[in-house]
Amino acid sequence: FGPAILQDAMYCISAGTAHTPQLGFAAILKAVNDGDYDFVEVVSEYGRRAKVMKQIFLDNGFQLVYDRDEDQELADGFYFTISYPGMSGEELLSELISYGISAITLDTTGSTRHAGLRICVSHATDERLADLKSRIQLFSHAQI
């Protein structure tokens, strides 16, 4: 875990970055370690929203592309991956865009699975979840 944090996460977000953001990031890490900042509380909103969004897709014929990490179920978080039977990622994205839903295809993320999309949770506010549900339902009914 240590090398992954240092060599993969820390390096990627700080290498080539100006000094001020590095100091800001260091201050956040210090506050977390000192118990002054509860980052879990802040990011738990993404998990709650992802759970609702995932269910909207699943209730309308979509499937999760990545639902497990080895033998453990994936937690809900910043994004999740979905597919729709019989459609490539590009076909699905093209269709969903016509319903006002954007995403990115899995092949652009480096995934070995290409029949699916990555759905970002951060841009979907609670106020927009009803719109998402109605648009996904419209899409689903059009596929029948």
What spans do the regions from the language model cover?
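Conserved core segment of the aminotransferase class I/II
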Residues: 1-44
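Conserved glycine-rich beta-strand-loop-beta hairpin in the small C-terminal domain of fold type I
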Residues: 39-54, 64-83
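A short linear hydrophobic-aromatic micro-motif
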Residues: 64-68, 102-107
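Short beta-strand-to-loop capping motifs
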Residues: 82-86, 121-123
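Non-transmembrane alpha-helical segments in soluble domains
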Residues: 26-29, 54, 81, 93, ...
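PLP-dependent enzyme catalytic core of the Aspartate aminotransferase-like
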Residues: 95-102, 109-144
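Soluble or luminal CAZymes and related metallo-dependent hydrolases
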Residues: 17, 38, 45-49, 88, ...
